[in-house]
Amino acid sequence: FPTVQILITGIGRDNARRLTIETLNESDAKAVLTCGFAGGLNPALPRGTVLFAGDDNFPHIEYLKKAGAKPGSFHCTDRVLITKEEKEAAHEAVGADAVEMESGTIQQLCDEASVPCATVRVISDAADETLPLDFNQLLSTDNTISHAALAKALINSPERIPDLIRFRSKITECAERLSAVLTDALIQNIQSSP
């Protein structure tokens, strides 16, 4: 059976770079999946859509397709795109289907190490949706969510709490959708192994 190692890099390129370098140096990775949430840029793709983009030599693309992931393109940025206007402008500028913050760095490191890599992301907020808070304002210097900044934002704007609770519910559904696709793809891989 294939060995699967899960690495949680956190938010942003710096965290992704540091932990991916460590992991690639300490393991004999045969392939890498960079997974997580993405903001929608393509207005035709609803929240909950699982997209993938991979190297031509990535060995598990067919499993992802059979599991329900759709081919797509990603734009990697240094910040969370909050408003539908920001997402529309990014879509017009780069034409990508979704936006996220880590896969470009992980892909580059895998290319340098000659390790096949694919990005698999679920759209957590569609192109026409504005996020309930500016999550960029909540990030600490190490790109983790600052609980103090979150508390301050909610104290200053308590009317956003219901929207944030609804967003949490939507995010949970998206995480479950991504998990189902990845689990199905892994099971297919195991079943096809000699």
Describe every region a protein language model picked out.
Residues F1-P194:
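Glycine-rich phosphate- or other oxyanion-binding loops that anchor nucleotides, phosphorylated ligands
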